Amino acid sequence: MTTIKQFLCGATVAGMVAATGAAVGAPAGLSAVTADWLLAAEHVLLIGLDGVNLSKVLEYAYDDDSGFKTAMDQGITGAASLTNHTTLSGPSWSTILTGVWDDKHGVFNNLFRPEPYNQWPTVFNLIEYNKPEVDTTIISNWEYLNQLAGAGGYSVDNNIFVPAGDSPADSDALVTALTIAQILGTEDNPDDISSFLFSYQSQADHAGHSFAGGSEEYMQSIINLGANIQQILAAIAHVQSITGDDWSIILTTDHGHQQTVTLPGLSIGHGFQSPNETSSFVIFDQAGDDANDGSQSLGYSTVDITPTILSLFGIPLRSDFDGVSLVNDPAVLDGIVEPTDLKQSLLDALAMYGYPNIGNDITLAIRTVIGSVPYFLDKFVTEIDTFLQSIVDQDIFLISGLAEVAQQINEFFGGLTVNVTNTVAHGFAYLLGSGVIAPTDAPLPLPGAAEFTGSLESLLAGDTFTAPDIGDLDLSLLLDVDALLG
């Protein structure tokens, strides 16, 4: 038995080879006279690290025991900046995972709304629609990202949410273990199924909010993350030694952190436009590119990540992307340099970033403040609900019943208040430039709207069927090779 994903991939590739003897649609920059690049598994890993200042990585984790340095030594590192864009996690991860800035996708705070991702499909949607044979996975301990990966008509195959646990560090350790298990699972891959894996860790952001980016706690979180990354990279090296499969690896963050506490035990952390908050980075290790190991990019941006992932799978890019592919964009490739001292060169690059003009600075600050009101209201309502639930769970005569009634009242009126304030905040955010640019590309068709009469979603989810022998198929009926060749 085989899955519909495996069959679609095999039939299409076989048809291309049989009819042309060449790889149709090979990615730019790759010369191929066979379809070997299509038949071999291609794996892409995106490691998301919330709230990590590159300057602190270079200070605390630039050593041979850290996965940060290993990744830098094996790839290309770019110091990036989010200047003129909101430095909140929801908007920033949306940019990373859609390839457009917040003036397009319209995400303005950390309360999940599915609507932006219907207009601006995520990397998961675009992979699942264009190449459903690719196995897509998210492993995350922030539920917003799991919701994002499940949004749109073509959601992620494997959506793994990791609970908070006893501490953010413990939760990240579990994310690391699950990520390694997912990687090791590709060792037994007889059907050469390609994969995209997004692994997200959050402890640095928690440390930054509680103790600020200049604290010992933040330092320890960076060291911990370096150790986690090292384990993940070791797992990839192990699998590669057995399978020979190609792995491309990207590391990034959504924003930086303020360096001092706002109040004892509390730091605003980020959301505004100081250089420490707008600090970001991209580390890119492309499979097969050993010539640029240890290099620096002067042009990497977080908005380039989704276009890059798509191009690695040979998927065409949207014309309304703000980002470009780091694989083959001429300007990006021209911006790769080989510094004599990578650490110092990256610090010099970070020092060049400053504040936006005063108008943008004020506008973005107002947008952050307004967008934060419904977010913190939601947290307050949730905390009340959790407290009342603890009383309900004790099953105390009369009191637990009253707590349950109070819980229902809190959920109704609290939820209504959050929804109303979030709608108002959304309107203000739009007036301040969030989501004002509409897509120019056509939306993705609804699942099941064309080729299949059944539920395409259920087929892509892994339902099995008896596949005919490819040698018995009339492949000319499956695809028009002349049309593909233009």
Where are these regions (language model features)?
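Composition-driven, intrinsically disordered low-complexity tracts enriched in small residues
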Residues: 1-42, 334-486
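Non-catalytic, well-ordered alpha-helical segments in soluble enzyme domains
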Residues: 54, 288-289, 297-327, 331
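Short, structured active-site-proximal loop/turn typified by the sulfatase FGly-forming signature C/S-X-P-X-R
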Residues: 55-91, 100
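Catalytic-site neighborhoods of secreted/periplasmic enzymes
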Residues: 105-110, 115-168
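Active-site rim elements
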Residues: 110-114, 216-219, 268-269, 289-300, ...
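Histidine-centered active-site microenvironments of extracellular/periplasmic hydrolases
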Residues: 252-285, 339-340
